[in-house]
Amino acid sequence: MPGKLKVKIVAGRHLPVMDRASDLTDAFVEVKFGNTTFKTDVYLKSLNPQWNSEWFKFEVDDEDLQDEPLQITVLDHDTYSANDAIGKVYIDIDPLLYSEAATVISGWFPIYDTIHGIRGEINVVVKVDLFNDLNRFRQSSCGVKFFCTTAIPKCYRAVIIHGFVEELVVNEDPEYQWIDRIRTPRASNEARQRLISLMSGELQRKIGLKVLEMRGNAVVGYLQCFDLEGESGLVVRAIGTACTLDKLSSPAAFLPACNSPSKEMKEIPFNEDPNPNTHSSGPSTPLKNQTYSFSPSKSYSRQSSSSDTDLSLTPKTGMGSGSAGKEGGPFKALLRQQTQSALEQREFPFFTLTAFPPGFLVHVGGVVSAGSVKLLDRIHNPDEPETRDAWWAEIRQEIKSLAKALGCHAVVGYSESTSICEEVCILSASGTAAVLNPRFLQDGTVEGCLEQRLEENLPTRCGFCHIPYDELNMPFPAHLTYCYNCRKQKVPDVLFTTIDLPTDATVIGKGCLIQARLCRLKKKAQAEANATAISNLLPFIEYEVHTQLMNKLKLKGMNALFGLRIQITVGENMLMGLASATGVYLAALPTPGGIQIAGKTPNDGSYEQHISHMQKKINDTIAKNKELYEINPPEISEEIIGSPIPEPRQRSRLLRSQSESSDEVTELDLSHGKKDAFVLEIDDTDAMEDVHSLLTDVPPPSGFYSCNTEIMPGINNWTSEIQMFTSVRVIRLSSLNLTNQALNKNFNDLCENLLKSLYFKLRSMIPCCLCHVNFTVSLPEKEINQGTSTASPKNFDKKQALQTTKTPVEKSLQRASTDNEELLQFPLELCSDSFPSHPFPPAKAVTVERASPVGDGNFRNRSAPPCANSTVGVVKMTPLSFIPGAKITKYLGIINMFFIRETTSLREEGGVSGFLHAFIAEVFAMVRAHVAALGGNAVVSYIMKQCVFMENPNKNQAQCLINVSGDAVVFVRESDLEVVSSQQPTTNCQSSCTESEVTT
């Protein structure tokens, strides 16, 4: 057999009382894997049983090891009746199948019951012995690593980035089977949890097979989603970017590659910049001095068609992005054609990554998105999901054609989402059209002289802003100006992207969170009529969301959006649209023009006075925002030395649309951006409401900043420990006043209150920045709106933020260490012997900085100690892909968990707030326990992808489904690394320090 699974049940603690007569429990354990079940002996009359069982051995195929979860069921023995279930534990075996990962899973796992929640803990030890299998027709993909992070993982080197992989599996939902009418809610929930866990494992295995066919060994930017289609079935789908990664193991290569962004952000990388308000976008990418290789498509057979891209391009060390010279050079055109042909040989040239090494992106065209409304049908054959595959293939093909229309051959920052209500499903996909770096192809057609000629052009840090399309045949109306940095190429007046801010971008001032929120009523209908009504509403919602984003961006005095995420949610009688992004001022783009209001009735004196009053308020708001975010761009003058400025009246013919005359000539000049060209015309009540919503947008309190990207542009010096907050709010709408205006107000209040609750809890951390603010909205029932938000607050040194020159590492770097624990909003309570019964304070926003249920003794047999100074391992959780003040030394595998919680005593458990708070706390406790059992001490790239709440107040019932994922890692603090490095020989210390300084 290719694999042997060994399980040992050690002990239990804090079990619930199951025998009312003795106030004790007669507990035993069932261990099940596949169709094989083992049982322990019954431990009589104890709430802390000590089974210390023998090793239970399962001889299984490696395919089953990937698909099946290990099920551990704790029961109470009853002599004369059926045994009572206490709870279950599902353990994913996949992290043990990596050659570099943990060798054993050992620790205390919370025993979870879908009705009662966590009911004690159980100590389990799991081992796997794998045999070499050289069968070329095998159906397993053991050894393929999965990463949730949307950047190349720390401590790894990207050899080849192959491209897009996708897969989906379908099945019937146990909640809607006929047997569900006669079985208990607990049995139904457990059947659903087990099926989802099984489908998740099967999905990872199938994607791993595609990666192996592409000669890769990892999937980065792995995004898995569950589509609960009701009676139609259950769909689990995933997308990712296939890569070939190499582990950096030597100390000389490892230390600079794993530098925490906290260290790199605390310096301003561009010390030659004369503008004091100009900062780098963030840390230098850890892969700056590494080799990336994109190989043209290889000729090998494929067993099945997959949507992937196998391109191979290798930027050399130190090459910046951008077209530093003229765009139309014959050599660059030749290389661009070669890269484009290599990309076009694959079906979908998509990348789920959002952060890239310098030089990877040559041009960014803008956001491309596509959507479709589908009518769900029953899944007749779970083994043949052609219908859903065809739906997504249509969406991806449209995305590809839109990118091509923008003059781009790839899509980066790609993501997919769905929204389902009854029989209607909205499929959405979005990404950023881009041109990837065509230099240094490995096909042998590029000679050294060409490379040397290309290397003569120095990077300008503005190339990704230059338009990739032909300005004489633009795909859409746009205002173009010459780049404010190089003065050679054309740039748009505004730039929208779904990726993180490139590391080599030049930003003026600070960034901020910008949101567009919209609600629209729709008539309640069924089947095709409902789908038609939604299809008719969608274009208008998308247009209004885009208009809101544009208006708010100009109101902030900024000219670019990064990390754009648009979510369209459908309910029974309404549609909701939410767009979140981080606004910045790019130095290469023109200064945004103001917002001018125009009315339809110029003869009305009072109306004109009202218009002028609003115009004054808008102008004052723009001025205040520029002062708040320190946006002070330098004046453009022709006396700047070394910057050739083109003629201000250079002729440029722009074809704005098919209906306009081709003889129209638009003259562009550098002062174009300073004109008030953006006009808001007030011609009805809705337009007036839009203007009022702009002016009533609540700014963050003094000392607070927020963004939805990992790094706040313009802030480079983090000083605090890592924390994460999660908030869930549910509001019930009144059916009496359901109008568009009332819906919009309620939706705005929901989002604002989520942010205000975080600001209030973090008021002692000022100055504070909320990073990676992630919003999710849903309409679980007819008159219920639900909002979920997660954020990672971080302190920064305001005095150092005002420094304008690069300072030495010793002066500018303030490492996050245990000395900063007084900055934690909730201090850690370390307890190794007992698991806290109430692991979170009674607040609606949940902090995850709590003690792990596993002590330090459970970190044995690991390659690296997680925390040398602490006596108890505290499992940290963060939505960021890094940990400030620390270096990630090892990735232990992906954490992907799905939980269901149901109650029939909602009021007794504290109502909706108490029920949701307790459930989220239990989810965090179970995630931390699984990570600690693997030997990890942190979860990075954490995301709560689904939180579906349903209630029946009349029956005092409620149900909630939560899906979370992240990367389990081992990290070591930089202070600990310094102690280790100081004990090394002097020569090694000097060499490592030199390389570290070069990296930062």
UniProtKB/Swiss-Prot annotation:
Keywords: Calcium, Cell membrane, Cell projection, Cytoplasm, Cytoplasmic vesicle, Lipid-binding, Membrane, Metal-binding, Phosphoprotein, Protein transport, Transport. Ca(2+) 1 binds at residues 19, 26, 76, 78. GO terms for cellular component: cell cortex; cytoplasmic vesicle membrane; plasma membrane; ruffle membrane. It holds the Pfam family YbjQ_2. InterPro entries: C2_C2CD5 (IPR037785), C2_dom (IPR000008), C2_domain_sf (IPR035892), C2CD5 (IPR038983), C2CD5_YbjQ-like_dom (IPR056430), C2CD5_YbjQ-rel_dom (IPR056431). Residues 319-328 have a biased composition (Gly residues). Its cofactor is Ca(2+). Required for insulin-stimulated glucose transport and glucose transporter SLC2A4/GLUT4 translocation from intracellular glucose storage vesicle (GSV) to the plasma membrane (PM) in adipocytes. Binds phospholipid membranes in a calcium-dependent manner and is necessary for the optimal membrane fusion between SLC2A4/GLUT4 GSV and the PM. PANTHER family: C2 DOMAIN-CONTAINING PROTEIN 5 (PTHR37412:SF2). This is C2 domain-containing protein 5. It comes from Pongo abelii. The gene is C2CD5.
